[in-house]
Amino acid sequence: MSIDPASATAVPHDSPQVGGDRLDRPVLLVAGVVVLGGIMSILDITVVSVALETFQREFDATSAQVAWTMTGYTLALASVIPLTGWAADRFGTKRLYLLAVLLFTLGSMLCAAASSLEMLVGFRVLQGLGGGMLMPLGMTILTRAAGPSRVGRVMAVLGIPMLLGPIFGPILGGALIDSASWHWIFLINLPIGIIALAYAWKVLPGDRVEPSETFDWLGMLLLSPGLAAFLYGISSIPDAKQSEGTIWTLQVVAPAVAGALLIAAFVPWALSGRNRHPLIDLRLFQSRTLTVAVIAMALFAIAFFGASLLFPLYFQQVRGEDALGAGLILAPQGIGAMLTMPVAGVLADRIGPGKIVLTGIAVITAGMAMFTQLTADTSYAFILGALFVMGLGMGATMMPIMSSALGTLEPHTIARGSTLMNIVQQVAASVGTAVFAVLLTNGILDIAADPTTDPVGYVAGLADSFATVFLVATVMVGLVLVPAYLLPRRRPAAPVDPTAMVGH
């Protein structure tokens, strides 16, 4: 019988908490550093997505070729995330965070100076190596600084870039490209990166390192290329479906199967008694709370990131909006999330994340269900209202799930736990994007195959295809209610190790 770390280390609710219940100035300063890093890495993904057409014109390339500016970044992200937990314990989170910001900022500067598509892809990989470390490191730093009793509130702070980046990124990207040039979608990272470096150097405390811990070389050789290959195969599915009419192409199957086999081979090695320090500690799944949180995060990420693909496409392909207009229409979703996120963080710390996540998922499901009624001329008032409702739910979902997982861990396992959660989120997001893109492509191909369809009928059929895919998204979000019901419904009370952030 396994023992949840939360139960093993629980203390009475009236026990003194490290740092008190309020987010004091040192924690808020640390949170500011982490938010800056998160804004850079997450905004960059969505800002670049609106520049793909510009890259095609600038470099005289095909859509498949310029897609490598996104794919290269994603593969670098997948390769470096598994190493982050070990590197944080080995070298310290402050040193590694500074390195991550430096790599990302340097990569941004080089991307802006790229004179060919090949150079741009290479520099995007450098960006991805830095960006892949920023979010798991941010979770580790904030959780250690605040302690379990305040993890909900600090996760709400970290959720600002995670939830708002996909919404406001297209707005920023469209504005920069229209008013200046594509170079500025990268140059805008330079002042943020320089400020983040100086800020992190000043306010991040030194932390304990484990110089005696050995590196899991075999684990790295199995997991990092395994994740990269699997995600490459999955991300190739939409293109294969559109160009070949099937997902069972060599471009999809070969990397996806090879990656899955490498990941599967990593599991017994990680659990082996000979492996004292696995790259990703799968023994963390002995915690029931973490296991449930991982399942909830996977289901939610599939639905959320998959649906995030649909919104701008509907506005552009059905309603004729440009990239900037589509981004502006999505703003109510961000406003709703901003309203509930800080409240959800406080309540998660007071009454446990379980009730908060249940409420959030129910609200998102209601908002998503409204999109199953989409037509080619659905009123914008209805759409904006549905987006606002979804935003209210999102602010009460993603970060409470994260806090429920990390709040049960001992200080020395937080880095590995945050790395695990980020891997799950990255894989699930890629799967969700691919699945929803294929479902939408199927609908579009069916409409295009009908020779009797006139332009008006095509647009109406296209809107129906979006509504059908939103029905799948609604069901997927609703399924999150099952693991959410099993999340903790009482205040986390595990003490944080006061030496966890002592400088050396």
Model-predicted segments: where are they?
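Hydrophobic transmembrane-helix bundles of small-molecule transporters
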Residues: 3, 178-295, 321, 329, ...
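Transmembrane core module of solute transporters
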Residues: 26-83, 119-120, 181, 218, ...
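Interfacial helix-cap and linker-helix signal at transmembrane-aqueous boundaries
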Residues: 55-56, 87-88, 172-180, 234, ...
